[in-house]
Amino acid sequence: MKHLHTFMALVLAISCCAVAGAFEKKQPKDVDVAAMTNETQRTSYAGGVHLAWWIPPEYWEASLSRDGNVTDAARKQVLDTLRGYSMIAVVQAEVGALGNFTFYERDAIVKGMKLELSDGKTWMAIAPLPEVPDGMAPLLKVLGPILSSAMGPLGQNMNFFVLDDRKKGGRLISPFETGALRISLSDNKGARLDPFLIEFPLDSLYVPRRCPNGKPAHVSWVVCPWDGSKLP
């Protein structure tokens, strides 16, 4: 058992050094939106309901590319508006004895929220834009009803925070590069909750590889953890 743990630790250490950019990316229409949501959405039920969701432009591109009701012109307009930005959606609520929700006000969420970004080596604090860009405001207004139909009251009470995804030489948060986003929230009494961690690269954006045993290999893996065989 000790040797197995040592081997797994070695696999994980090597995996952290994998260059995802060398692997084949999926076309937007082939991205599994549900799988991508699983990688970018985190939920805690500590003293209520707490949900945080990082939404990159790739999410919208994948969603719109699969929607036959959206024209090419409308799709381009939306994606051009979103390009250069990502979003974080947060909803927090107390849950009553009968299952009723009492949602946190936006100010309370902002007060208890802390965002940190890692490049795989160091962490740095980041912050959302103080104001929503003009072009994005109409889009955010229609997201509430859409999420409400999909998630009920939780979706209707989502709070959206916009991040400027542009930086010199690339993107602030790239779902294709090694790193992590840490989202820390607090409850309504000010107690810090266990942070949410979203790790990159996102496996859902890549054409899957398979280990010899047929199990899927995460995009960050260099070798298969079950038998140590090298992945292509």
For the regions a protein language model found, what residue spans apply to each?
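Conserved functional micro-motifs across diverse proteins
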Residues: 21-220, 225-232
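Bacterial N-terminal signal peptides that target proteins for export
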Residues: 1-8
